[in-house]
Amino acid sequence: MYMQVESRTGTLLHLKRNPSIRSWSLLVGILSVGLAAAYYSTDTWLWKLFYVAGCAFVALQNLEDWEEAVFDKKSGKAILTTYSIYKKLLTLCKGGQDQVVVLLKEIRDVNVAEERVRYFGKGYVIVLRFVTGISHPLTQSAVLGARSDVEAVAKELTKFLELDLVRTRSQAVEESSDSESDGALDKQ
């Protein structure tokens, strides 16, 4: 699952993403290796502690982040937040959270981008495109294989931000200006 709609009202869209089952399975697998090495080893308790701590460190490093996106029409802002247990441990609970705040009126388009994920193939992520020309992904990691899930979230986000209405209006304005310029050329 790419992102789940936590709540949706007329003025608020709250999207959330938790670590995937693959990520949790990897965590359990790596921790199991450390525990098995400690259990079956004839080394001292200090080495056994090192095995478990080392594997726990690697397991937490490979755990995906918790990601959240809140689009609020009342405040006119989108807040993209990323939480990481690994960063929290490294900074001794002072960090572990990255936050990006964007004005909703700056978002021009919402697209699904394809990313190459090493060893696994293709992944998909939603990209927010701004009027300044800058692009920013909605999440830090791509989801593997399920393009339809990502497109459904992108469609929901486009509908909430009313970007499809903006496109329709701009196309209508372009067509009317084209027909006016054609009419002016015909008169000459």
UniProtKB/Swiss-Prot annotation:
According to the UniProt record, which cysteines are disulfide-bonded?
A: none
Q: Where does the record say this protein resides?
A: Endoplasmic reticulum membrane
Q: Name one GO cellular component term.
A: endoplasmic reticulum
State where it is primarily located.
endoplasmic reticulum
Q: Which InterPro entries match?
A: Cybc1 (IPR027846)
Its Gene Ontology biological processes?
Answer: innate immune response; respiratory burst after phagocytosis
Q: How does it sit in the membrane?
A: Single-pass membrane protein
The keyword Oxidoreductase is annotated on this UniProt entry:
no
Job description of the protein: Functions as a chaperone necessary for a stable expression of the CYBA and CYBB subunits of the cytochrome b-245 heterodimer.
Q: What is this protein called?
A: Cytochrome b-245 chaperone 1 homolog
Organism for this UniProt entry:
Xenopus laevis
Gene giving rise to this polypeptide: cybc1
